[in-house]
Amino acid sequence: MFKNLCDKIMTQKILITSALPYANGPLHFGHIAGAYLPADCYARFQRLMKKDVLYICGSDEYGIAITLSADLAGRTPQEHVDLFHHINQSFFEQLQISFDHYSRTTWKGHVEPTHQFFNDLLQNGYIEERTTDQLYSEKDQKFLADRYVVGTCPRCGFENARGDECPCCGASYEATELKNPRSKLTDASLILRPTKHWFLLLEKFKKPLMEWLETKNWKPNVINFIRGYIDHLHARAITRDMKWGISVPLPDSEGKVLYVWFDAPIGYISATKEWALLRGEEKLWEKYWLDPETKLVNFIGKDNIPFHASIFPAMIMGQNQPYKLVDELPANEFYNLEGKQFSKSDGWYIDLEDFFKHYTSDQIRYAIASNAPETSDSEFTWKDFQLRCNSDLLGKYGNLVNRVLVFIHNQCQGKVPESGVLEEQDRKFLKNIQDLVDQAAASYSTFKVRKASQIMMELSQLGNVYFDSKKPWQDAKNDYTKGRMHTTLNCCMECLKALALISFPIIPTAASKVWQFLGFQTPLEQEDWNRVKIEKLPLNQKILTPQILFQRVENEAVEREILKLQQLSLTKEKKSTPQSTQISISENILLKPLVDIEDFRKLDLRVGKIIQANPVPKSKKLFQLLVDIGIEKRIVVAGVAEFYKVEDLIGKNVVVVANLKPANLMGVTSQGMLLAAKGEGNLKLISIEDVAPGSLVS
């Protein structure tokens, strides 16, 4: 019975997916830190644990944004996605992301499972047809989706509001609510015209989703977010009026395609089917997707939580195939760059192609892993990158490997020496090694890559301290102490073996080299974690001459990279200056005539203290704030959710327009407005310290 249980555990199937990257541009470091490096570390570890691992990903290639970008670039949508599919696939290879298969949603086999989902959901009563008014361009002779539309915000009157949300006040709305809507491409006026679409009735899944969620022990940030999201589930359109996408499988649906968020997660299934076909075993995919004993792990960024924790599970519940529901959902927070969000449009990013001309995949993998955004946002800085590379990889890890192996080559003819009688310090050292190996395994298995990277360096430092304290160079001077030297070096070799093992998921190139230096013929990736952990190094095994594992990152290189980043950002800013200046003149002079002092005096500006802050349901931009303005406490809805965390707002003194007429924003009545300064990609509330709530501002 015990053997059967062990066999079941050892052969457990683990299906790992990373969120499909959108083939609308090249990847950047922020993407890698969220869904790809953590997944790859987990996959590599579980393979070492001899689990039946299948790691699947692919390009997400449909959607309105693709057609918009392709139009602007003068390419067809297919040419556009072909370009970025291959660029991103190449980046993944350079980063050594070990997908078992990397697919794409434009491959013909993706259509069948997508249609199967739609037909099942329709027949089971979870999809219904509705006719709604949508914005239509008579000039272009087509309906325009949100991304193609601009107009006047129905809330604050800003004239360049986007089709789904206002960048000025943060309000979310339907594109049909815009005043004076016009085409983003041609500036042509738009009219409302009825059109038919199909809606997924997500509200029908609230109860089963909540019951299913109760069985999960996910990160608190995931559970807390998705509970609120499920509470507000409602019917969502799953079709669009366009040509680029998966067709709607109904006879009266010409010119309609399935919305990208509907078909994209089905790409996990179609990619697995393609993998099986390429192996010549057409039904092999069923072993993973249709077996309830399979462990399904979806690695995503936090912006994908709604789709993977509610919408796609609802789609699976509503169709007829016994597909696996996700078991684990490691959702990471955002990874920023030098204090700001990565932004290609703002020139605030690191070009991966350029990066690989100067640095290695191990360097960036370790730098990201050691500061992974697992529970809160984190950031990449060039100074920190230099510190991680020089102090950790070179100074601790590389130094230990080099000094031990060079010493053995010089004193032991390049062979693993025999250990003598262990002293208490030796036994403690070897036990600490085993403990750290176990801790690393626990960290990898629970998606704690950051902790695993710390353990890796703790083991490196443990070996360095032991080597220094035992002073084998002194024992080498006398024949009667060489036995002691051999014992020290044998223990150090055990440390290097363990170090190669636990570091392989994070820095596979360096770890594999260390493994080869130790004289092993079998590639490390094919080894068994538990066997390597307990087996001793063979006596007299011939070791290889060590090579340099890591290069130093010089100050000049860091200064060059920071300057390059600043220049790229400045170039982007200059290119946008003419348009920005034109908009500024239009908004600040033409739209806002001069006022006299009496008009200004009509405003009641007061200091308010924020005492509560809560996200507004169904809005990414808005917070509902409870503000003390001295004479009373008021609800104020503010579009600051992108720029402030709840804890940053509590207790903050702000300036409130206290006599503004109440306005309804996303179902919440706002009794005022906060003053803020808004720059390119940033917003700061006007704050006044050390002044009592209710104080007048003039």
Curated annotation (Swiss-Prot):
<protein>
    <recommendedName>
        <fullName>Methionine--tRNA ligase</fullName>
        <ecNumber>6.1.1.10</ecNumber>
    </recommendedName>
</protein>
<feature type="binding site">
    <location>
        <position position="166"/>
    </location>
    <ligand>
        <name>Zn(2+)</name>
    </ligand>
</feature>
<dbReference type="GO" id="GO:0000049">
    <property type="term" value="F:tRNA binding"/>
</dbReference>
<dbReference type="Pfam" id="PF09334">
    <property type="entry name" value="tRNA-synt_1g"/>
</dbReference>
<feature type="domain" description="tRNA-binding">
    <location>
        <begin position="599"/>
        <end position="698"/>
    </location>
</feature>
<feature type="binding site">
    <location>
        <position position="169"/>
    </location>
    <ligand>
        <name>Zn(2+)</name>
    </ligand>
</feature>
<dbReference type="Pfam" id="PF19303">
    <property type="entry name" value="Anticodon_3"/>
</dbReference>
<comment type="similarity">
    <text>Belongs to the class-I aminoacyl-tRNA synthetase family. MetG type 1 subfamily.</text>
</comment>
<keyword id="KW-0479">Metal-binding</keyword>
<keyword id="KW-0030">Aminoacyl-tRNA synthetase</keyword>
<feature type="binding site">
    <location>
        <position position="153"/>
    </location>
    <ligand>
        <name>Zn(2+)</name>
    </ligand>
</feature>
<comment type="subunit">
    <text>Homodimer.</text>
</comment>
<dbReference type="InterPro" id="IPR012340">
    <property type="entry name" value="NA-bd_OB-fold"/>
</dbReference>
<keyword id="KW-0963">Cytoplasm</keyword>
<dbReference type="InterPro" id="IPR014758">
    <property type="entry name" value="Met-tRNA_synth"/>
</dbReference>
<dbReference type="GO" id="GO:0006431">
    <property type="term" value="P:methionyl-tRNA aminoacylation"/>
</dbReference>
<feature type="short sequence motif" description="'KMSKS' region">
    <location>
        <begin position="341"/>
        <end position="345"/>
    </location>
</feature>
<comment type="function">
    <text>Is required not only for elongation of protein synthesis but also for the initiation of all mRNA translation through initiator tRNA(fMet) aminoacylation.</text>
</comment>
<dbReference type="InterPro" id="IPR014729">
    <property type="entry name" value="Rossmann-like_a/b/a_fold"/>
</dbReference>
<dbReference type="InterPro" id="IPR029038">
    <property type="entry name" value="MetRS_Zn"/>
</dbReference>
<dbReference type="Pfam" id="PF01588">
    <property type="entry name" value="tRNA_bind"/>
</dbReference>
<dbReference type="InterPro" id="IPR023458">
    <property type="entry name" value="Met-tRNA_ligase_1"/>
</dbReference>
<dbReference type="InterPro" id="IPR015413">
    <property type="entry name" value="Methionyl/Leucyl_tRNA_Synth"/>
</dbReference>
<keyword id="KW-0820">tRNA-binding</keyword>
<keyword id="KW-0694">RNA-binding</keyword>
<dbReference type="InterPro" id="IPR041872">
    <property type="entry name" value="Anticodon_Met"/>
</dbReference>
<dbReference type="InterPro" id="IPR004495">
    <property type="entry name" value="Met-tRNA-synth_bsu_C"/>
</dbReference>
<dbReference type="InterPro" id="IPR009080">
    <property type="entry name" value="tRNAsynth_Ia_anticodon-bd"/>
</dbReference>
<feature type="short sequence motif" description="'HIGH' region">
    <location>
        <begin position="21"/>
        <end position="31"/>
    </location>
</feature>
<dbReference type="GO" id="GO:0005524">
    <property type="term" value="F:ATP binding"/>
</dbReference>
<dbReference type="GO" id="GO:0004825">
    <property type="term" value="F:methionine-tRNA ligase activity"/>
</dbReference>
<dbReference type="InterPro" id="IPR033911">
    <property type="entry name" value="MetRS_core"/>
</dbReference>
<keyword id="KW-0648">Protein biosynthesis</keyword>
<keyword id="KW-0862">Zinc</keyword>
<feature type="binding site">
    <location>
        <position position="344"/>
    </location>
    <ligand>
        <name>ATP</name>
    </ligand>
</feature>
<dbReference type="GO" id="GO:0046872">
    <property type="term" value="F:metal ion binding"/>
</dbReference>
<keyword id="KW-0547">Nucleotide-binding</keyword>
<keyword id="KW-0436">Ligase</keyword>
<dbReference type="GO" id="GO:0005829">
    <property type="term" value="C:cytosol"/>
</dbReference>
<feature type="binding site">
    <location>
        <position position="156"/>
    </location>
    <ligand>
        <name>Zn(2+)</name>
    </ligand>
</feature>
<keyword id="KW-0067">ATP-binding</keyword>
<dbReference type="InterPro" id="IPR002547">
    <property type="entry name" value="tRNA-bd_dom"/>
</dbReference>
